Amino acid sequence: MKSTQSQCAQERQGHPISRRTFIGLSMGALAAWLAGCRATITAQPSPITPPTPTSPPSSTPTPEPSPAASPAPPSPPSPTPTLEPSPAAPPSLPSLTSHWPATATSRVVVVRHSGVWVGSAPDPQIVLHMLDAGISALSDTADVLAVWRALSAPADRVLLKVNCISAGGPTQPAVAYAVVRRLQDAGLSAENILIFDRTDGELAAAGYTLNDGGPGVQCHGARGEGSVAALTQASVRFYQDLDAATAIVNIPTPKQHGSAGVSVALKNHYGSVNRPGALHGNWCDPAIVELNAQPNVRDKTRLVVGAALSVSPDDWNRPARENALLISFDPVALDTVGRDILVRHRQARGGDAGSLIEGARHLGTAQKLGLGATDVNLIDLREITLG
């Protein structure tokens, strides 16, 4: 091939070649070209054996992570509350309302909505929406009416214990009326519902419509003294209205208290007896716990709904807006969450929150006596923001 190239180069340089030499060179080039084509045609790719359908190609297995290294599954979302009946079996009252120490923890649900206030008044529809969301999260049940039916039978006489001792920071009527609405939706007659606090005057000043014996929801103060509660510090009498009730929904509002540290669900029942002043010694401890342990309170209480749309961290007539409802079956756990909210607001105002914590010593006594949980490790806190 080198000689051929040399000869071609010579031809390009103008050196003549003979006819015989030209024919020889041409035949050699043709032979080389044919040899290349033959090599191309015969060099077919090696055949590939397709995989057998019943025997797929094996692969090296990927090692599974150890269980300890697996991330914890996310918490399931709260069910979407609905008023449509559920095909599932309705919850039973004992299983629904159980809390610590009968269960491992006590659940408290905090539902917030930044738009709940319209000027100086709460929006009733938003409050009702907050209540539904809280009941659904508390019970892990989307069918909120099934929960209310479990909490009250048609023949029950349900007392809603509100707190109206201060016109500046009472239980907001919109919260009590939302509870009334759902009790009626669940089948309870309006006449079997009583919105109650110790005096007519305090109820009226807080914005409630009084009704004593007329058609519709009842609303009035105490109507006479009834059964005795013999406590360590003093003997007091429940008002007859507590004796007559077969079920209680406790609807307090969180506020500071000079003799108890805080007043939320437990302290609210000082308005259920005739001589509350006799129970204020030693930071209301253990009187406040013993009172709530009485069958007239403990056995009848179905639910606690903390009206924390506004709270009173220092001055009852200077409330702070929290835009929240606190909902639980455990009054001690709810009071603990309410106390922490009061602490936050007082500190935000530059105040010392020590008395709120040290003064609420009855919470520890309540846990020791099995009334509910105040230890943070025993409280299952669920917080929901709707808007």
What are these regions (language model features)?
Residues 1-17, 28-35:
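N-terminal secretory signal peptides
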Residues 40-97:
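Ser/Thr-rich, Proline-interspersed low-complexity disordered segments
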Residues 162-164, 182-185:
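N-terminal entry module detector
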